[in-house]
């Protein structure tokens, strides 16, 4: 999905993300079992590493990183990571972790798919679990993706009901399947809630260029958009400045502009990370597609809390969203997976 090479920075203070250094795993000394004693050998922490092509503030890698920090606290893993790794350096970093005794390596392979798969094949005893547009490969390369089209659809319902100009927009990264399906799901919901809406779509050609995303959002607002899907960082800032409404993406970003951000689809990588870590710990790891762990029914995605908007959203809008969410969770309704180029009216 991602081939980011943009080094634009945004204020790291905006994101509640600690840059604390990862502690080295505290390995308990193995206790030799005396003949007939039954003493157990203390287990060493599972060594896990992540390799990210972008800064960890970027939404996609941020969510993976947050889940791995959670695994460090809850599952006791020894976690290290490398961020903003250029494509040309990806192979070296992967090899460094694999040769250093890392048992599970995660991250996004979109910037270096061929290299990541090649290195995985050369270290068959190391589990590789990467965001990828391809499938798993035996014996050790597993994949996942951000299947958050379901909450994106729910956000579209809200946008369709809340627009006053009958014009909604989306500023997104690139016209690739993983992005297109989110924008199309958003539009599906918006059209269902309001058949009269027009749609404005802009791709900025980067996964991390907040100034460019803001510029694109301002152009859409000037064209009449009054509810915008902020698929990339930078859009919410424009929406706040111009007094329109925004839908965030990947994480709960309400704190950036509480009066602007109604909600947004949240990608929770915890179910995926938990499943992968437990498999490796149990010695039961096999090459798999972990994609299903990102669906709402698995807890891998959900609608961000309304926060202050809970009191401001009309009751009929909240009921519409709640009813549709229930049908998604019970399996009686499926959101379309449309990876074609999103429309722009």
Question: How should each PLM-predicted stretch be described?
Answer:
Residues 282-345:
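Hinge/cleft segment of the Venus flytrap/periplasmic-binding protein
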Residues 1-17, 24-35:
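N-terminal secretory signal peptides
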Residues 121-145, 250-259:
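Flexible loop/hinge segments that line or gate small-molecule binding clefts
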Residues 75-83, 195-207:
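Short beta-strand elements in bilobed, periplasmic/extracellular small-molecule ligand-binding domains
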Residues 102-109, 129-131, 223-233, 249:
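Periplasmic-binding protein-like
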Residues 47-72, 80-88, 110, 175-181:
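Extracytoplasmic "Venus flytrap"
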Residues 136-158, 170-175, 258-271:
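Short beta-strand elements at the ligand-binding edges of bilobed clamshell
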Residues 68, 154-197, 201, 289-313:
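An alpha-beta-alpha
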């Amino acid at each position: 999905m991602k081939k980011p090479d943009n080094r634009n920075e945004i204020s790291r203070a905006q994101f509640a993300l600690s840059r604390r250094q990862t502690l080295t795993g505290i390995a308990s000394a193995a206790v030799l079992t005396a003949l007939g004693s039954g003493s157990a050998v203390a287990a060493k922490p599972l060594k896990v590493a992540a390799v990210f092509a972008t800064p960890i503030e970027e939404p996609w890698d941020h969510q993976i990183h947050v889940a791995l920090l959670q695994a460090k606290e809850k599952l006791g893993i020894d976690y290290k990571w490398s961020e903003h790794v250029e494509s040309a350096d990806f192979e070296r970093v992967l090899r460094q972790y694999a040769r250093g005794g890392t048992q599970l390596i995660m991250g996004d392979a979109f910037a270096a798919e061929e290299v990541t798969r090649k290195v995985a094949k050369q270290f068959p005893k190391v589990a590789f679990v990467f965001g990828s547009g391809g499938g798993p490969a035996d014996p050790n390369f597993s994949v996942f993706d951000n299947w958050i089209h379901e909450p994106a659809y729910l956000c579209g319902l809200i946008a369709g009901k809340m627009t006053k100009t009958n014009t909604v927009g989306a500023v997104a990264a690139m016209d690739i399947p993983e992005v297109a399906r989110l924008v199309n799901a958003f539009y599906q919901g918006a059209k269902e809630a309001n058949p009269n809406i027009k749609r404005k779509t802009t791709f900025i050609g980067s996964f991390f260029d907040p100034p460019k995303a803001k510029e694109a959002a301002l152009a859409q607002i000037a064209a009449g958009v009054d509810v915008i899907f902020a698929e990339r960082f930078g859009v919410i800032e424009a929406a706040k400045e111009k007094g329109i409404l925004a839908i965030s993406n990947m994480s709960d970003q309400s704190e950036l502009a509480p009066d602007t951000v109604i909600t947004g689809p949240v990608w929770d990588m915890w179910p995926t990370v938990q499943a992968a870590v437990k498999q490796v710990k149990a010695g039961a790891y096999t090459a798999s597609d972990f994609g299903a762990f990102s669906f709402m029914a698995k807890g891998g995605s959900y609608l961000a809390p309304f926060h202050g908007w809970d009191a401001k959203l009309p009751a009929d809008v909240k009921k519409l969203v709640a009813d549709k969410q229930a049908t998604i969770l019970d399996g009686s309704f499926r959101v379309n997976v449309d990876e074609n180029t999103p429309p722009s009216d």
